[in-house]
A protein has these predicted regions:
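Mid-chain, structured segments of secreted extracytoplasmic proteins
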Residues: 75-99, 109
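Sec-dependent bacterial lipoprotein signal peptides
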Residues: 1-20
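Surface-exposed short loop/turn segments
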Residues: 21-33, 95-162
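Short secondary-structure boundary motifs at beta->alpha junctions and helix caps
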Residues: 63-78, 138-181
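Short alpha-helical linear motifs
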Residues: 53-56, 128-133, 151, 167-172
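Sec-exported extracytoplasmic/periplasmic mature domains
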Residues: 90, 94-98, 176-185
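A structural "domain/chain start" motif
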Residues: 20-83, 184-191
């Protein structure tokens, strides 16, 4: 009887500490580092094309990730992680004065992979996007970039769930930073 009560208490504690919530990532904001790097790169103005999920991938990969039990994280951009990549890049380009809806150069992207694992011990997340830069009919850049993160993930869901969402959101800034730093990308948009 005592063992059963202990197990029941443990199960109730797990349910209580994990709860259930639908977390929406914050609206992308420009970072000082990415904006500065864009301004220093001497790039031509550009516009953004479509950002979509790769054909054949499960739609859920673009919609949300489970965070222990009934908790989920989703993007504020029409519920699409691909659109969140686009918006993350858009705010950086706009902050650097490089966004022009009439520009010849177009940046587009395809979400190839999106993973989030908030397991106890070590949490992990990654996103992979294939970016393309075209000017007119000429493809000037095409490359898949991946951003990864690992963090200490608490046993307690009340700590681990927001931490996982925060680290996952940070991957988008990191990915945009990788794109901006890529010499081939800079060459494709050089003035």
């Amino acid at each position: 009887m005592k063992t059963t009560l202990v197990k029941l208490f443990a199960l109730a504690s797990v349910v209580l500490f994990t709860g259930c919530a639908q977390l929406t990532m914050g609206t992308p904001q420009p970072t000082a580092e990415n904006t500065t790097n864009l301004k220093r790169a001497n790039l031509a103005e550009t516009r953004l094309g479509s950002f979509t999920l790769e054909a054949g991938k499960p739609a859920q990969m673009d919609k949300g990730h489970s965070l222990r039990g009934a908790n989920t994280v989703q993007a504020p951009t029409n519920g699409s992680f691909a659109e969140y990549v686009r918006e993350s890049l858009r705010v950086e380009l706009a902050a650097a004065g490089l966004l022009d809806p009439k520009a010849d150069a177009v940046i587009s992207g395809v979400l190839l992979d999106s993973q989030l694992d908030p397991s106890m011990g070590t949490g992990k997340g990654s996103i992979q996007v294939r970016f393309t830069v075209t000017k007119g009919t000429e493809k000037r850049y095409e490359k898949a970039l991946t951003a990864r993160s690992e963090w200490e993930s608490s046993f307690m869901g009340a700590v681990a769930i927001p931490a996982a969402a925060q680290h996952y959101e940070g991957l988008y800034r990191k990915l945009v930073g990788q794109l901006i730093a890529d010499p081939d990308f800079r060459k494709a948009l050089a003035k």
